[in-house]
Amino acid sequence: MSNLLGIFDPMEEEKVVLVDIQDQQIGTMGKMEAHEKAELHRAFSVFVLNSKNELLLQQRAHEKYHSSGLWTNTCCSHQRVGETNREAGARRMMEEMGMTVPLEELFTFIYRATFDNGLTEHELDHVMVGYTDDDPVINPEEVADFKWMEMEALQKDLTENPDHYTVWFTIIFDRFYKHIQEKNKTA
């Protein structure tokens, strides 16, 4: 993943951090192999809200190896070895959405989802939130499109059209939304 100088080498296969259910690192594995073997690994999901309480969604690039063309939360990926959740979130927000947004960690959960192509996501997912009124400058290799969506309308659309969204987003959204509603009550 990195050369002797510690610089990331994009030609080297991306590795994921394998973890136990307490999020303790137990090793690393190539990303594709981890998804083929359904190994539990560390991941993160970023949700960005604007001042109108709309969520920034991305449509995954059509070339993605799973869940291509589906709508999902603002950004999601995997931490690198030694990288904090916020560092990983900031890195991928810049790579995918072309923006910098301060992130706050909200909660973690474990999920497992098998896809039609035989790959399985088995992740301990760290969910983070950020706030901005800026539109992203999307990287077309990662993201096909974006939109801001009002939370209640999104909740309704997730119920009516779940096949338009990634599996993990349908799993996370209600918990995220409840967390934000509680946070807004105490603010």
Question: For the regions a protein language model found, what residue spans apply to each?
Answer:
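The catalytic Nudix box helix
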Residues: 56-57, 72-106
